[in-house]
């Protein structure tokens, strides 16, 4: 049973665009964390098309990847006209131009929140401490520099079992990815409110 953390709040994520960057180190732990995160985003109304997932080799690369992913999203502009995939050109031709798919603002605009997911397990050297400290500070810097919430989904644990418990793969344990999904929706909604001058 999960007894720590804030009481979950209900927020409508249907208008949000969320970016996720995850490390591939400790993949057996990463996979359930990512699944839990995405499941909670979808449960909060975030559209599948508005969830963008990228991976990097390890947690060390998370800050630069999160930063550049957000920068790339700022360069995207919504299309005002028809947008066709290569398959659409032949497979689903139509003379009714109003029936053609279009790219919506929510599926191409800047992200409302970003989630960084990684797993650091302490070994015999100081490598763990250096990486954990640098990644923590790096991700904090990204969110303060961009003004976009970056959810800290990096486990810093002492043993494999601690990691498994926090990924919800041990019976009776809680998947922390669900918490990260909820936090991303809440902070994404708040960011939009702040941008609109809302303080209540």
Curated annotation (Swiss-Prot):
Keywords of the record: Riboflavin biosynthesis, Transferase
Pathways per UniProt: Cofactor biosynthesis; riboflavin biosynthesis; riboflavin from 2-hydroxy-3-oxobutyl phosphate and 5-amino-6-(D-ribitylamino)uracil: step 1/2
Catalysis: reaction(s): (2S)-2-hydroxy-3-oxobutyl phosphate + 5-amino-6-(D-ribitylamino)uracil = 6,7-dimethyl-8-(1-D-ribityl)lumazine + phosphate + 2 H2O + H(+)
UniProt binding sites for (2S)-2-hydroxy-3-oxobutyl phosphate: 124-125, 166
GO biological process: riboflavin biosynthetic process
A single cellular component GO annotation: mitochondrial intermembrane space
MF-aspect GO terms: 6,7-dimethyl-8-ribityllumazine synthase activity
InterPro entries assigned to the protein according to its UniProt record, in alphabetical order: LS (IPR034964), LS/RS (IPR002180), LS/RS_sf (IPR036467)
EC nos: 2.5.1.78
Catalytic site positions: 127
Function of the protein: Catalyzes the formation of 6,7-dimethyl-8-ribityllumazine by condensation of 5-amino-6-(D-ribitylamino)uracil with 3,4-dihydroxy-2-butanone 4-phosphate. This is the penultimate step in the biosynthesis of riboflavin.
Oligomer status and interactors: Homopentamer.
NCBIfam families in the cross-refs: lumazine-synth
Entry-linked HAMAP family: Lumazine_synth
Family note: Belongs to the DMRL synthase family.
Name assigned to this protein: 6,7-dimethyl-8-ribityllumazine synthase
Species whose genome carries this gene: Pyricularia oryzae (strain 70-15 / ATCC MYA-4617 / FGSC 8958)
Source species taxonomy: Eukaryota, Fungi, Dikarya, Ascomycota, Pezizomycotina
